[in-house]
Amino acid sequence: MEQKFYICKHCGNIIAKVKDTGVPVICCGEPMSEIIPGTTDASVEKHVPVWTVENGVVHVKFGSVEHPMLPEHYIEWVSLHTKQGNQRKELHPGEKPEVCFALCEGDEVEAVYAYCNLHSLWKA
């Protein structure tokens, strides 16, 4: 199943759906909205994750220009979707906008998602 993320338009809760049985996801008494990830980025700050695999480690950065990591504008989290499952890492203002994930032998990257607090979800 392709990874899907949903956001509540009232409180801002974000969830990742693990299994889809067709029942709407509800928060604050209303259905949550699916977040459709961007895949190309024409803005000055690059958001699309760029990943490489070296010796079983997935290295993730964001575009050709380093993304700001300020309290008002930063990458909140990164999610790695592989053939065997998912991993997620949180980032905080002031940190370098890079993460690494361990990849088990035989596993393969299917997608990498990054969530910017201002510009929403991005996918590579």
Residue locations for each model-derived region?
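Cysteine-rich micro-motifs
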Residues: 21-32
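Short cysteine-rich clusters marking metal-coordination/redox-active sites
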Residues: 8-11, 27, 116
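Exposed aromatic-hydrophobic patches
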Residues: 61-62, 98-105
